[in-house]
C-alpha cells in the first residue's frame, strides 16, 4: 500500500449550479480550456434543482480558477486553500471489505473532518484540513 499526502491544493465549491445535463461538463470544459488541471471532483445535491460542485486544484491555480468562474457563472463560489489531500493506493483496494469505513472512522477518532471523498477500485482520497495531514498520515499507517 502507498500513502501520499499533498499540501499543494485548494478546495473550490461552486454553489447552486443548475442540476441538468451538461452543466458540469461546461464548467470543467471551461477550466480545461484555461489549462486548469482538476485533482478531484465531488458533487452534492443543492436546494431545489441545483447542485454544489466541489473540486481540488493546485493552490497556484486558485486565483485564476476563481476569476474564471466569477466572470462566467453567476453562482456563489467558496474556496479554502488550507486543505490537503491524503490518498491511499493499493492494487485491489476495492476488494478489501470495510476499508473505507476503517479509514473514515480513524479520521473521526482523531477529530479530523473529511471535506471531500473520492474513491476508485484502487484508491481512496480524502480532502482534510492541512493542519491535520501529518497526524492523519501517521494514524493511517498505524491501522494498515
Give, region by region, the residue ranges found by the protein language model:
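A conserved regulatory-domain signal marking ACT and ACT-like small-molecule sensing domains
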Residues: 1-144
Amino acid at each position: 500500500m502507498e500513502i501520499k499526502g499533498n499540501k499543494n491544493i485548494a478546495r473550490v465549491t461552486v454553489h447552486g449550479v443548475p442540476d441538468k445535463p451538461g452543466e458540469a461538463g461546461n464548467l470543467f470544459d471551461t477550466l480545461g480550456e484555461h489549462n486548469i488541471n482538476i485533482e478531484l471532483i465531488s458533487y452534492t445535491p443543492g436546494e431545489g434543482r441545483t447542485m454544489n460542485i466541489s473540486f481540488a486544484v493546485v493552490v497556484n491555480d486558485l486565483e485564476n480558477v476563481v476569476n474564471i468562474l466569477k466572470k462566467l457563472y453567476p453562482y456563489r463560489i467558496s474556496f479554502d486553500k488550507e486543505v490537503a489531500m491524503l490518498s491511499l493506493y493499493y492494487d485491489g483496494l476495492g476488494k478489501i471489505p470495510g476499508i473505507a469505513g476503517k479509514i473514515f472512522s480513524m479520521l473521526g477518532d482523531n477529530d479530523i473532518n473529511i471535506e471531500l471523498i473520492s474513491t476508485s477500485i484502487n484508491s481512496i482520497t480524502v480532502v482534510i484540513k492541512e493542519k491535520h495531514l501529518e497526524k492523519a498520515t501517521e494514524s493511517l499507517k498505524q491501522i494498515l
